[in-house]
Amino acid sequence: MKRIEEQARRLDQEYQAIGQLFDQFCQQAGTLAEQYHFFNWPDYEDSPPLSRAFTLLGEPRELRLRCQPGERSALNGLIQVVSEDGTIDASLGFRADGQLLLESGKLLDNPPGLLLKLLLGAVWQHKPQDEITVQPH
């Protein structure tokens, strides 16, 4: 029973840390809206917890935080760019200590740069197929 309680306490701490990292990421990444005008990052927050509403190229989107099990029963965070229809356009995984999963560095090393990567990934996902495929003339 003691081991289960310790594991539950650890998972709760990791969950809290992931939530705090997401909040800090959103606060720091918001400066990107001042540099580029292809997306709008509102100052007010009407979004549910662990998410952030914004617009990308005039279309409503949401930045969502999800948690998922990782190696050795650790909890990982997953930031997702989600379109209005619920499609996940881009995502970025990280551990509770902020270490990124699929690239070097930490989540808070350069939040505006990471958000820009996510946004560009989201735009690329929604490119019409005829623009992606080169048609022979």
Stretches found by the model and what they are:
Residues 1-5, 9, 55, 95, ...:
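Alpha-helical context
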